[in-house]
């Protein structure tokens, strides 16, 4: 066989390879169809605030580990969403920074709430443009923490932040974003703040948000597919629904022990 004859031969694929290709394209088409439906549903909810349009699901968005995406379980996302909504009014704004599963939970709760219930404004700050199916999306890159629409500055009453990476740089820049978004204290009560991140970030996080009164809570968020790092929830308030209390600090325990020893 000459080289010329070899070049003229048709390339053939094995049946198993063809089946794998067919499955790949079928899954791709199904995912595209799912996103189209989700986008239509999100737009419908935004325009008409329909109460029976069905539940949105974070499962429509496959986790991208390159984006450090690890979705919360539905139970955790709903709990955090309800804490953000507790006592909120319709003239408030809730910002969700790098925690899209909580944003989806907020959308579902507000979408199914009874008529007359307060419906605060939502804004999602997220790097993943797949979430552009939601009109509330604002593109966010923690490396440029203040590169955001000017109308969001000092506009948010409640904020949840889950920095994508367990690094001092990422945590510090995310804190800059939170400060930029927060309403000044003199205008209202202090911004209600929740930060969810690794246990090893505890000393840094509580220092970065000291002015907010942020403390470690006894609630540990659960991720849908598990997470090897120990994860904490930090907040500047204790839950009125008993979802969490603040953990006792070491210095508090020492002071209490000294007080008991004095016998007063």
Q: Model-predicted segments: where are they?
A:
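S-adenosyl-L-methionine
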Residues: 1-120, 227, 256-258, 262
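Flexible, glycine-/basic-rich loop-and-beta segments that form/coincide
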Residues: 241-264
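A short SAM/SAH-binding and catalytic strip from SAM-dependent methyltransferases
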Residues: 156-171
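Local beta-strand N-terminus motif with an aromatic residue
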Residues: 91, 155-156
């Amino acid at each position: 066989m000459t080289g010329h004859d070899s070049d003229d031969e048709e390339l053939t694929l094995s049946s198993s390879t063809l089946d794998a290709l067919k499955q790949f394209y079928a899954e791709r088409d199904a995912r595209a169809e799912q996103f189209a439906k989700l986008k239509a549903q999100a737009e419908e909810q935004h325009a008409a605030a329909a109460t029976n349009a069905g539940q949105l699901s974070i499962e429509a968005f496959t986790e991208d580990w390159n984006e450090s995406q690890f979705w919360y379980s539905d139970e955790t996302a709903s709990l955090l969403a309800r804490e953000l909504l507790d006592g909120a009014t319709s003239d408030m704004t809730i910002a969700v920074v790098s925690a899209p599963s909580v944003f989806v939970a907020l959308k579902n709760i507000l979408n199914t709430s009874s008529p007359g219930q307060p419906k605060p404004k939502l804004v999602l700050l997220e790097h993943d443009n797949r979430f552009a199916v939601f009109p509330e999306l604002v593109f966010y890159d923690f490396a440029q923490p203040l590169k955001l629409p000017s109308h969001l500055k000092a506009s948010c009453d409640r904020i949840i932040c889950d920095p994508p990476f367990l690094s001092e740089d990422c945590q510090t820049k995310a804190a800059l974003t939170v400060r930029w978004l927060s309403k000044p204290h003199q205008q209202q009560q202090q911004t209600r703040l929740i930060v969810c991140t690794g246990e090893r970030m505890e000393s840094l996080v509580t220092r970065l948000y000291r002015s907010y009164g942020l403390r470690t809570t006894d609630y540990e968020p659960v991720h849908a597919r598990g997470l090897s790092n120990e994860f904490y929830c930090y907040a500047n308030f204790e839950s009125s629904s008993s979802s969490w209390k603040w953990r006792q600090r070491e210095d508090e325990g020492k002071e209490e022990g000294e007080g008991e020893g004095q016998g007063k």
